[in-house]
Amino acid sequence: LMGKLTLSSEIERLKAIPDFQGTNWSSIKPEFAARMAIQNQFKTGIDVAKYTASIMRKDMEAYDSDTASYTQSLGCWHGFIGQQKLISIKKHFGTTDKKYLYLSGWMVAALRSEFGPLPDQSMHEKTSVASLVEELYTFLRQADARELAGLFRELDKAPQDQQQSIQDKIDNFETHIVPIIADIDAGFGNEEATYLMAKQMIEAGACCIQIENQVSDEKQCGHQDGKVTVPHSDFLAKINAVRYAFLELGVDDGVIVARTDSLGAGLTKQIAVTNEAGDIGDQYNSFLDVEEVTAETMNHGDVLINQNGKLVRPKRLPSNLYQFKKGTGEARCILDSITSLQNGADLIWIETERPHIGQIGAMMDE
């Protein structure tokens, strides 16, 4: 349902305004102003984000109690498409409950870039996602206004004995505003850039932001090969940046989805900083493809690390990227997921080369 605002209470509130007591506003009808207010209960994107965040948290709690109580998210790339989807859902199911919209980075790259259709490599404009979030909620608010306008017309035409039932429909109207899961890719830069972009997306109405652990300027579509990940400290800094954006804007229960692309990523941009054996940097580096070396077998320009008391040389490509050991993707996904959930993420996403429930289930069991 929408907010607690009811038509009758809003009419009474407006009538109490001093200017309605005299003749200055004699041509203004409180009833009409109240209807307009009911049609526009979400004044800003922050209002939308707060409202939808509470819905998403409630749905997450319901799913934790009963996995049959799941949500469904539909992808969309234009406000009109999103609007028509929600109108159809509400008409068919009688409710928009547990129905979300999903705003994918690849859709934005392919269909919303000023450069024209692009591959999913974060080459589109940084502001494209936030613009689409704002557009979607503009169209969804219009869907509310349209349906409520129909109810207002019914109320005007209805005989006295039928007006209360129509009034109840208005007061219990279910909005088309639903949560949007918005893809921020890898943050489009460092943590400062991530914070600024997340803030813009939240101001547009996003209550949920999905972020991935790829290198921002090397980012690939989740289904493509050649992906490059970053150490956990870099990724967690961006998760923190998104959380700070939520908190600054007053969306205290905003949702962060941490996506790991490690299953299809055989490369890392850098060796993680580690201060002691077993810390998160050391765990990340333990997956590197290395060979033990001595002073005699070292080459000019080699990068060497001390790993478990041994001097080793990580395999470095001509691109200056470092290679992980083969077959470590699932183990890295598990470490990524646990680390993200322990450090501020609310949900996790494990990117696979194709939908594979068994594969995901095995990693969750592990």
PLM-predicted stretches and their roles:
Residues 3-366:
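Alpha/beta enzyme core
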